[in-house]
Amino acid sequence: AVTVASQKVFDAFYSNDDRKALMHGPTFMGNPLACAVALKGIEIFEREDYMSKIHRITEISHREMDGFTDPRIREVRIMGGCTCVDVYDPSTLEGFQQFAYERGVFSRPFLTCMYTMMPYIIKEEELIQIYDVMKEWFRR
């Protein structure tokens, strides 16, 4: 495999020590198998009208989360299958991962963001369950 980079980029990742060297050259090349899989994914995405599924998720997300406020919340953002509840203080989310897990939801906050990235095949009741757990965290 060949990876093309400027000398500056090359120098930043080059090392004779395998623990420090960039070992992802093949990650960035046009792997034929990866390209074939990507094309098949696009075909399925279009054939099964995933855009309508994304719109449905977005509508449910807005219905469930628009207007949800708490003094600890900076903002709630929704785009497609992603929802982010951004808080002012990261300590607000300490313990949320276990709290959510105990209620059947796998979620891990990142810094000040409690977020979801919904699979496009999610059922409405599953989506509502996730949002209920998120809201319950702030109401406890």
Regions found by a protein language model. Give the residues of each.
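Conserved N-terminal phosphate-binding loop of PLP-dependent enzymes in the Aspartate aminotransferase
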Residues: 1-140
